[in-house]
């Protein structure tokens, strides 16, 4: 363990990468397999299309996104100290998705590589872990990836869930930086309104209480934004973008 530092470092995003499967599933496509239509989906979610894997999986998407992020950075892969993959749909119990990414990218064998699972908040938790690693190690760069193949845990007869999710991956290469991004605030969560028992379980599909999720978003979103602005000594006029994970256009608007 390292001796503690007086100054906590933040993080800076160096580059990004993404990967999407080829197949596009439109709202009209879904209307042919479940009781729904384009107007119903668009009005309630704002979603027009989503992507679905046919030949790829969580791991291959993660590798592609990671490779794109590394290529865009111009960073020597020998300087990458860790790989963290946030996923709830890993293809293997082990080895981890991150370990496979490490191998496929040709990273050093002593690179720290592990997965974490925290559903919708997984990538944000990966950012927090990455920041913590910068403050406890000599790592120069860390590769963070969010990758999901949600299609393998969706019930395509359940219109409350199958319209919301798709497959894809995103990656960022981060480095330590003073006076940059850091965690400011957490809000509360719930363990009952969005559930997936797991691949291999008797009921392995995603189940969601949509009304409860909607009420949660409406009730908590403004409160959370107000708290963050207060802690940052900022106002809403200072903000250019707000990035939300949403299940309805109403909280977004």
Role assignments for model-derived ranges:
Residues 42-44, 48-60, 88-141:
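Conserved catalytic cysteine-centered active-site region
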């Amino acid at each position: 363990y390292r001796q503690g530092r007086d100054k906590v470092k933040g993080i800076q995003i160096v580059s990004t990468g993404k990967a999407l499967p080829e197949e596009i599933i439109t709202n009209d496509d879904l209307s042919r397999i479940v009781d729904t239509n384009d107007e119903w989906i668009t009005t309630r979610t704002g979603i027009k299309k989503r992507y679905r894997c046919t030949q790829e999986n969580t791991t291959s998407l993660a590798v592609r996104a990671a490779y794109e992020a590394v290529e865009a950075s111009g960073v020597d892969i020998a300087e990458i100290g860790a790989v963290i993959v946030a996923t709830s749909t890993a293809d293997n119990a082990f080895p981890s998705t991150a370990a496979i990414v490490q191998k496929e990218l040709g990273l050093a064998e002593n690179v720290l590589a592990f997965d974490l699972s925290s559903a919708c908040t997984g990538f944000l938790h990966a950012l927090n872990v990455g920041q913590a690693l910068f403050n406890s190690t000599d790592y120069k760069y860390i590769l963070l990836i969010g990758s999901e193949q949600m299609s393998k845990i969706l019930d395509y007869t359940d219109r409350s869930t199958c319209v919301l999710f798709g497959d894809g991956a995103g990656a960022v290469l981060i480095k330590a930086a003073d006076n940059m991004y850091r965690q400011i605030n957490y809000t509360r969560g719930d363990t009952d309104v969005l559930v997936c028992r797991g691949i291999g379980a008797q009921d392995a599909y995603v189940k969601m209480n949509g009304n409860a999720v909607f009420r949660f978003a409406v009730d908590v979103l403004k409160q959370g934004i107000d708290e963050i602005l207060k802690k940052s000594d900022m106002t809403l006029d200072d903000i250019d973008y707000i990035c939300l994970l949403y299940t309805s256009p109403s909280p977004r608007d």
